Every structure is written in C-alpha cells, then in structure tokens.
Design a protein with these regions (language model features):
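Interdomain hinge/lid region at the active-site interface
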Residues: 141-202
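A general structural signal for well-ordered alpha-helical segments in protein cores
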Residues: 1, 26-27, 72-75, 99-100, ...
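Short acidic/histidine-centered micro-motifs embedded in hydrophobic/aromatic stretches
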Residues: 131-135, 184-188, 206-209
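Internal alpha-helical scaffold of NAD(P)-dependent oxidoreductase catalytic cores
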Residues: 33, 39, 54-145
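Rossmann-like NAD(P)(H) cofactor-binding subdomain of soluble oxidoreductases
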Residues: 1-54
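Acidic/histidine metal-binding catalytic segments
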Residues: 125-132, 178-182, 203-204
Length: 214
C-alpha cells in the first residue's frame, strides 16, 4: 500500500480522497498521499471475496471505515451507493482483522470439514455443498435476528452430552483430523453456550464427554 501511495501521491489534487481496503492496516499507510493534501482513510469490506476476477455483491454488506473526517464521509457515500452499510471502527488493529478472518475463513474451513463428512456418507459433492451453504445462511440469519450467544443451537447449547459422545465416536471412525477439529471447537462452543445460560452441571457433563476416550 505504501509503495502505491508513493507512486500516485504527486499526481493528486488537494481535493482528492484516497482510501485503501486492507483491514489490518490503518490510514497511515497512505501518509505520502496525505502529505500532498489528500484526505486519507480505510474502507474495509466485511464481505468475502473468494476470487480476484469476480466481485461478490456488496448489497447488504458492511464496510468498516476510518481516517480523516473528509475521507470517512466519502467512504460512507461509496458504501451507500453500493447498497451497503458503513460503521466507524478501529481499522488500525490487527485484532479487528483477526475477528473478520476468524469468522470468514473459519466458516469456509468448517464447511470444508462438514462437506468431507457428508461425502464420506455418500453425499454428492455439490449436494453436500448446497446443503451446508443453506445451513450457513440460516446461522447468519439467526445471528442477525437474535444476536449472540442466543443464535447458538445444537447439543452443546442444550447440554446434551450423550449426543456429543455419539458425534465424537462417529468422527473417530471417519478420520482423526475431523475429530480433532470437533474437539478443538468444543470449548469455544461451550463458552458460548454458558453465556447463553447453560447451567454448570450440564456444562461439566459436556466437558466429560470431550475428555472421554470412547
């Protein structure tokens, strides 16, 4: 970003607004443009871009914006023109970008694991992918409508340790990496369940199910 900023800075008018879209970098990356009078800022899309040649729909998405007041105003106008929302946030923190990556990259990777399980059971690849995509959309709807942690569903959310044990036994037979992924997520899901009101007794039963070697 800094190299590009250096290359264009001398060609900018003082009325220019320059924005970059990197979520883990702040507006200081554009300091060369700022020195030439441009308003600088960040406009990071909380939208997944899986391809460098095809742009996803921006409508309904959210941009996190930051920078000088003039740059922020311009970024908000661009977001509205795209049919998207904008929110003023701390875009200079790698932790902010980690939050976005954890969800976007984690969801895609978990979909890969889930599709792998379904394919081992005889699902056609595209049928499995469409099924998991529909499930992901329903989760997104629940997060938007109910918020977190209320959007959490499933056996850990209701303290069903017997079903957790059945899941682990089945995954152990399919492949240890899948069981390891399930076990790694267990404490995170349990933390969410407890925030939603799962009582201590059932939480302990869930922990025992994860410790079991069966």
């Amino acid at each position: 970003i800094e190299d590009v900023a250096e290359s264009i800075a001398a060609h900018l008018r003082e009325s220019a607004v320059v924005l970059h879209c990197a979520g883990a970098r702040g507006p200081e990356e554009l300091r060369a443009c700022a020195r030439h009078g441009a308003a600088t800022g960040v406009m990071h899309p909380l939208i997944s871009f899986p391809s460098s040649t095809a742009s996803p729909s921006l409508r309904g998405g959210t941009f996190t914006v930051g920078g000088s007041p003039r740059a922020v105003r311009a970024a908000r106008r661009i977001a509205r023109a795209c049919g998207a929302r904008s929110t003023l946030g701390i875009t200079t923190s790698p932790a902010y970008h980690a939050a976005a990556a954890l969800l976007a990259n984690g969801a895609a990777s978990l979909a890969f694991s889930s599709v792998t399980i379904l394919r081992s059971l005889g699902f056609e690849p595209r049928s499995a992918e469409r099924a998991m995509a529909g499930l992901l959309r329903s989760v997104a709807d629940n997060v938007e409508q109910l918020g977190v942690p209320q959007a959490l569903t499933g056996p850990i959310a209701r303290g069903d340790s017997e079903t957790v044990a059945l899941h682990r036994s089945a995954l152990r037979r399919i492949g240890r990496p899948l069981l390891e992924a399930y076990d790694a997520l267990g404490p995170v899901i349990l933390q969410c369940a407890q925030a939603a009101g799962l009582d201590d007794e059932r939480a302990e039963a869930i922990k025992r199910a994860f410790r079991s070697r069966k």
